[in-house]
């Protein structure tokens, strides 16, 4: 059980909806599994944090997949999450790292690139999917998710994401927030929010200082204005299994399976999301062939 969690809140009498997350241990689990280098860890961790909070907006068995592809050296960052606080992610090139940028921070923009898009696919059940996309405008990811909400979901939002990495590549702190303006919000409320966000300390610094998700929202919105509705745990969780990969092998067709038996006398599958390996014996593949006959 991790100490990570997300809070859902309202502020300014329901004019603002807010989510904040602590994801240090969750991102650490992904870093350990994929052996990401610091810049890749920051990019993956920011994407995981945003995806976990987007998952918290879903209901029941709904889930979503986020693909960040800025055509940069890191390749694609793929994360998915559900409404239960379970999130997983991987990057195409985990050993991506660059010198710090001019601000002395991890150069996420350089790793991600700025020539692609963020694609969000929500599985809302009953074989019904919602898909949205927006161009990458910054490469730092917080601004890119902000832009996604404004253009794809027509929800004025502010997304802040932060990941700090220790010298030994472990994750020192990770977390973030999504603050959304609800229809009918007063101009005065929006102005207060914009001012608070423009003046705030960077998210990763606030988490490093030990601020909880509740503390993060209080810092931005003011303690008197925030009403916490719910708190839910967040963790790295992968739903891969021996059976799921066996079904995937079945989908390759008879000729390919016969080839595996003849050439390799079995098969091995590796999960992109968690790195788990699954081995399939010649006998298992023969049984699979019989089921296709």
UniProtKB/Swiss-Prot annotation:
Subcellular location as annotated: Cytoplasm
UniProt entry tagged with the keyword Chaperone: yes
Superkingdom: Bacteria
InterPro entries: Heat_shock_Hsp33, Heat_shock_Hsp33_C, Heat_shock_Hsp33_N
Disulfide bonds, paired cysteine numbers: 238-240, 271-274
PTM characteristics: Under oxidizing conditions two disulfide bonds are formed involving the reactive cysteines. Under reducing conditions zinc is bound to the reactive cysteines and the protein is inactive.
Keywords carried by this UniProt record: Chaperone, Cytoplasm, Disulfide bond, Redox-active center, Zinc
A GO molecular function held by the record: unfolded protein binding
Single GO cellular component term: cytoplasm
Gene Ontology BP annotations: protein refolding
Main location: cytoplasm
Family, similarity comment: Belongs to the HSP33 family.
Function (record text): Redox regulated molecular chaperone. Protects both thermally unfolding and oxidatively damaged proteins from irreversible aggregation. Plays an important role in the bacterial defense system toward oxidative stress.
PANTHER family on file: 33 KDA CHAPERONIN
Name this protein carries in UniProt: 33 kDa chaperonin
Organism: Staphylococcus aureus (strain JH9)
Organism taxonomic ancestry: Bacteria, Bacillati, Bacillota, Bacilli, Bacillales
